[in-house]
């Protein structure tokens, strides 16, 4: 009987250890996510108040920064386990991501009550993100199986966005933004469940996933609100 008791005790100890490690992992992920949002906010602030003239004069500035942003993201995926380089790359990427939001933010700020529109989009994004995260953590429904379907929809949205660069249709842009808002809402459910189940290798991966979900949902909602307020 004592043998079974010892096995049970060891099993219980292992479960407690794993649960503790997962809790630390989740805590670190959300701390990095919050810090990433702060870095992006600083980037957007610098873009609006220090680099706005460069964005207004030429689109080249945006595309250069966008290329740097993508490069930093790939570098981060490659060096995700190498501290402190991974943190430098993470905050470099999110700061640069904030900079690339400058053209959109400037266009909204040029509208009547543009600041209020941005605040509304941010508030809606925050409430939606919090609500969806809580739902994902408590529901019995498994959203982690939706990865392939979500990725296919993402590819379609990217392709449609690239095509609309040529057509410049406001209706198509509104439709893309609406679908994107729904897509990234599901991505929040998907990524949150992957994080709480420990499916990411590092907290940085989880933080980047949540950051991209939040920012893309914010951009989608901001585009929708801008469309309605510019008519």
Swiss-Prot record:
Q: Where are the transmembrane segments?
A: 36-56, 58-78, 83-103, 143-163, 170-190
Provide the Gene Ontology terms for cellular component. Answer: plasma membrane
Question: What keywords is this UniProt entry annotated with?
Answer: Cell membrane, Membrane, Transmembrane, Transmembrane helix
Q: How does it sit in the membrane?
A: Multi-pass membrane protein
Task: Enumerate the subcellular locations listed in this protein's record, separating them with semicolons.
Answer: Cell membrane
Coiled coil: present as a keyword of the record?
A: no
Pfam families (alphabetical): Bax1-I
Q: Main site of residence?
A: membrane
What protein family does this chain belong to? Belongs to the BI1 family.
PANTHER family referenced in this protein's UniProt entry, alphabetically? BAX INHIBITOR-RELATED, MODULATOR OF FTSH PROTEASE YCCA
Q: What is this protein called?
A: Uncharacterized protein Cj0236c
Gene source species: Campylobacter jejuni subsp. jejuni serotype O:2 (strain ATCC 700819 / NCTC 11168)
